[in-house]
Amino acid sequence: EYKADGIDNTDAIKGTYLDNDKQIWDLYLNNSTCEPSMISSKTGDDAASEFSLGEAVFYQNGTWGYHDIKDNEVAEEDMGMLPIYIGVDGEENQGLCTGSENYWCVNKNASEEDIQATLDFMKWVVESDEGRDMLANQMGFVTPFTTFADYLPDNPLVKANAEYTKAGKTPVSWNFTTMPSENWKNNLVGALLKYAQGTGTWDSVQTAFVDGWAEEYAAANE
């Protein structure tokens, strides 16, 4: 919706593609490793375990999830990444959703000694051999720092993302940080869960998504 409307934020989401989202959500529910009514009993650890042991075909996560699934039944050469297609014109030219919602910050109210120690540590992480090896090889992270040219992670998921970029696919923008509030997300999850369990309707999901967005945005920007 952001892409179609040429925006990067909004105070009132329209839910233009909610029908498409419903098809994907139904696909998930009808092809899960458990009954739809039982999805709330599953955890992220369950999902990682089921995928890495070959019990599930798909595992929705990012490149950072590699650490949780490596060295198990699924061989690295059998791992890849696939965009979540929802039936929108032109999406075949899109790649993966890329970005970050986490940042390194230094508390300006800390003591000068602590501030300097923190900056020194951050520099060590991105410039020292030990720090770069830790991020790239031990954790398998892809990083934006120019000091990592010789420390590209041996992570098949990172390589899969690079292949999409090499093929000229346009990355999908990272819009998680524009959600109006954590409460909006929690209410939407609750509506999706009730729909999955058969105690709620998709209309309730739409209400939580659209009306809830406007309400939470207004509350957060009073």
Where are these regions (language model features)?
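Periplasmic solute-binding protein
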Residues: E1-D8, E92-K108, N183-L193
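Glycine-centered hinge/linker elements that transmit conformational signals in sensory
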Residues: Y2-S41
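Short helix-initiation/N-cap motifs at beta->coil->alpha
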Residues: M38-L53
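Beta->alpha turn/N-cap motifs
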Residues: G44, N61-Y66, I84, S100-N102
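Alpha-to-beta junction loops
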Residues: L53-N61
